[in-house]
Amino acid sequence: MIDEMMKRATLFINEFHAINDFDKDVFVKEVDRTPSQMIAYQLGWINLILSWEQDNKDGKHVITPTENYKWNNLGGLYQSFYDQYAACSLETLIERFQQDVHKIIQLVESYSDQELFEPGGRQWATSTPANWPVWKWIHINTVAPFKSFRTKIRKWKKMKGQ
């Protein structure tokens, strides 16, 4: 899982090195997010997982995705991610992404196999009827979007002639 996360994270973030900071907020018709929004989305989910874990360690009951956003309002949650990172340069977003991926890898390494792979490993992972094991929450919010958003940024670059 960690190897795949590192591989997908690297492939995803390396796509941004050739993008000029002036273009970070440019929409192209064929892609639903700007380059900065693509990274902000990843940062938002990674940091939600990290905050869920910290809140559990602090004895707090976690409500997913957040107390302010429910699963039927993910558009509002995504907008909050974009707003949170809107003032950041592309270079800063890339650096934060790399740092936060390192943090999520450290988190995965800290789990026992039982905590990671069996349902009920963490309270926050049992907060929906699906009762997924922790690994699935992490995979769906890291590896999977790293892969799908790499396709998006490659399409964005192609449409921009980069």
What is the meaning of each model-derived region?
Residues 1-7, 59-62, 88, 92, ...:
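Solvent-exposed interaction patches of small proteins and small membrane subunits
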Residues 1-8, 30, 96, 141, ...:
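Short, contiguous, pocket-lining structural segments
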Residues 4, 15, 56, 84, ...:
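Residues that form generic nucleotide/phosphate-binding pockets
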Residues 6-44:
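Long, hydrophobic N-terminal alpha-helical segment
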Residues 8-12, 45, 49, 89, ...:
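Alpha-helical packing segments of well-folded alpha/beta enzyme cores
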Residues 14-17, 21, 47, 51-54, ...:
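Charged/polar positions within long, soluble alpha-helices
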Residues 28-76, 119-162:
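Short, contiguous alpha-helical
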Residues 73-117:
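Acidic/histidine-rich alpha-helical segments that form the ligand environment
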